[in-house]
A protein has these predicted regions:
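Periplasmic N-terminal accessory/gating domains of Gram-negative outer-membrane beta-barrel systems
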Residues: 87-110, 114-253, 270, 278-287, ...
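Outer-membrane beta-barrel translocator domains and adjoining extracellular loop/strand segments
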Residues: 95, 207, 270-277, 321-329, ...
Length: 456
């Protein structure tokens, strides 16, 4: 009897795990689903459907109801070609696949005695009828057109219901965690993910005097393929009750291609709206001295249709003049450097099996920061925040309506706040201000995670 009970408990636990995994939806891919019909609206059975993008083509067939489905499709723009005996082939161009979403299609095949093909160009449906979650997805094309700072925090501010506690003017606060909150419930209810793996670091938010919630990884805006922000109706695997930000980076394709960029903003390009009364007293408001960013990416095939590599790197330098809080105070420049590096290796092991390896290194250095009304320049600190992130993911499509994905990820965030005044001086507090030096903070919190995702 005890042995039977253990078996029953094991079976129930396995079923619970499978059910939870089935509901998981925080991934780095989407699905394509459709139906083949003839001119009378009847389903076409046994048709061949091909999904063609920038990597290896995928093929499937239509069932007794004319339905077809492609699972675990990476974000991007594709063409879908359908063919069946006795019908003219038809191609749907410009099919957009977004992370975490289902793209629905209906393809009409016309009866034909000759070998011909019809190409249809049109907009991909923007509404997923089977999607419960609410939020917004930004595709690569949108990311280049939205007039915001090149910063993920400024991007998520475009989503209704999300607010930031930091004003980011043209990227002058890109080195600062934006502190996004959802529905005015504090920054602790926003979670972060990259390639579907959670990167929320509760200590990092706490160390910056924010509520729990933050991330020590700073993103390279130029590497985004898709950014998904989920604000409601989330799956059970979401680890908070608020919003979730999921970033999917680019990848190598069958075409060797790359890009480079250089961006610069100068203090001479800014206007000054400081009141004359304040200027006459010698007070200075915060301003941007300069913002400089350069970076590049390169990706392509190692083995066509089988193995692809993509890598990117960037550096952003930000220099600010902080606000002065007395007539005699001389503003000390605050500088920051962000250096994110990324690499992704994708492999098509077999037709149903794919493998992805991802690595990102994020180095953030901020010097002379945290000056404020109670923090004169002598209490400035230097922030050093290096972080490494590794992920391996394997996906297998068992049938047109069943696939599984398993991944493991490791994150090693470090945080160090070094007072400019040194560690050998006492912290004094008088006149409603700190003096001489400030507190030293340090943290290192390695994090492991794994996930099994089964969907039908």
């Amino acid at each position: 009897m005890p042995r039977l009970s253990r078996r029953v408990l094991l079976a129930l636990a396995s079923a619970a795990l499978l059910a939870a995994a089935t509901l998981a939806a925080q991934t780095g891919s989407g699905n394509v689903q459709g139906r083949l019909i003839d001119e009378h609206g009847s389903p076409i059975v046994g048709g061949t459907v091909t999904l063609q993008g920038s990597t290896a083509p995928q093929r499937t067939g239509s069932d007794a109801q004319g339905h077809f489905r492609f699972l675990q499709v990476l974000p991007g723009t594709y063409s879908v070609t359908a063919a069946a005996p006795g019908f003219a082939a038809a191609t749907r161009e410009g099919v957009l696949v977004s992370v975490g979403r289902l793209t629905a299609l209906e393809i009409l095949l016309r009866i034909s005695d000759v070998n011909e093909e019809l190409t249809v160009s049109g907009e991909t449906p923007l509404i997923d009828p089977g999607r419960v979650a609410t939020g917004q997805t930004f595709a690569r094309e949108q990311l280049t057109e939205i007039p915001t700072a090149r910063d993920v925090w400024a991007l998520v501010q475009q989503v209704p219901g999300i607010q930031l506690d930091t004003v980011n003017v043209a990227g002058n606060a890109s080195a600062t965690l934006g502190g996004p909150s959802f529905s005015n419930r504090g920054s602790g209810n926003v979670a972060y993910a990259i390639e579907g793996a959670t990167i929320t670091d509760s200590y990092y938010g706490f160390a910056l005097n924010r509520q729990n919630g933050g991330t020590s990884i700073f993103f390279d805006y130029g590497t985004f393929e898709d950014v998904e922000v989920v604000t409601g109706g989330s799956s059970l695997d979401q680890q908070n009750s608020g919003a979730t930000l999921n970033v999917v980076t680019k990848r190598g394709t069958n075409t060797l291609k790359g890009s480079a960029r250089f961006l610069y903003a100068s203090a001479n390009w800014q206007s000054d709206n400081t009141p004359e009364s304040s200027s006459a007293n010698g007070l200075q408001t915060n301003s941007t001295r300069f913002i400089r960013e350069y970076g590049g990416e390169l990706g392509g095939p190692l083995i066509a249709d089988r193995l692809w590599l993509w890598a990117a790197g960037a550096r952003q330098d930000i220099s600010l003049s902080p606000t002065t809080f007395s007539e005699t105070e001389v503003p000390v420049p605050e500088t920051a450097t962000l250096e994110p590096w990324s690499a992704k290796l994708n492999a098509q092991i077999s037709s149903p099996n794919s493998l992805a390896l991802f690595y990102q290194r994020s180095d953030r250095s901020q010097y002379g920061t945290e000056v404020g009304p109670k923090r004169p320049p002598e209490t400035r600190v230097n922030l050093l925040v290096p972080s490494d992130f590794y992920k391996i993911e394997d996906s297998y499509v068992f049938a047109s309506d069943l696939f599984a994905t398993v991944f493991g990820a490791y994150q090693k965030p470090r945080f160090q706040s070094l007072p400019v005044g040194g560690l050998d001086r006492d912290i004094e507090y008088y006149g409603d201000q700190y003096h001489q030096t400030y507190f030293y903070k340090a943290s290192q919190q390695p994090q492991w995670q794994g996930n099994l995702h089964v969907s039908k």
